[in-house]
Amino acid sequence: MAKFVIRPATAADCSDILRLIKELAKYEYMEEQVILTEKDLLEDGFGEHPFYHCLVAEVPKEHWTPEGHSIVGFAMYYFTYDPWIGKLLYLEDFFVMSDYRGFGIGSEILKNLSQVAMRCRCSSMHFLVAEWNEPSINFYKRRGASDLSSEEGWRLFKIDKEYLLKMATEE
């Protein structure tokens, strides 16, 4: 592919971001779990206090998808803090459409994220990868990523909204 642009997402990109989130969820066999709306993305990412940041990969018109989409990849991230090592960039979602893989788009997105992390003086970038997703695991390992689950024995937990509400309202 001759050229593509990696740029910060704008509010106008929310429909494309949601489309790609759903494509990623389908790839991960979790499509039914996406309950987020375009309105949520708009309010949560482009309001006064954004909860996330996003980069998009855009291709020129001659490379648009058959459906007419110019946005073919994205990375959603936010900043967090580790009391042992300081600032972290947390990569929440990262996806390039299958027909656009192998052209350096994913590598360029990761390069841009690394530049953001360095500008913000982050200690590292953290993210999750499904155990079965060998292509992604290899993509990250080729770039120096280490698997904290196997190396340090960390386990990921979550508390769903119903239990948060229960704890928040206990007397």
From Swiss-Prot:
Native source species:
Homo sapiens
Q: What is this protein called?
A: Diamine acetyltransferase 1
Q: In which pathway does it act?
A: Amine and polyamine degradation; putrescine degradation; N-acetylputrescine from putrescine: step 1/1
- InterPro entries, per the entry: Acyl_CoA_acyltransferase (IPR016181), Diverse_Substrate_AcTransf (IPR051016), GNAT_dom (IPR000182)
Listed EC numbers:
2.3.1.57
Which Gene Ontology terms of cellular component type are present?
cytosol
Q: Which gene encodes it?
A: SAT1
Subcellular location, in the record's words?
Answer: Cytoplasm, Cytosol
**SUPFAM superfamilies named among the record's database cross-references:** Acyl-CoA N-acyltransferases (Nat)
**Record-annotated N-acetyltransferase domain positions:** 4-171
Which family is this protein grouped under? Belongs to the acetyltransferase family.
- What keywords are assigned to this protein? Acyltransferase, Cytoplasm, Transferase
Q: Is Nucleotide-binding a UniProt keyword of this protein?
A: no
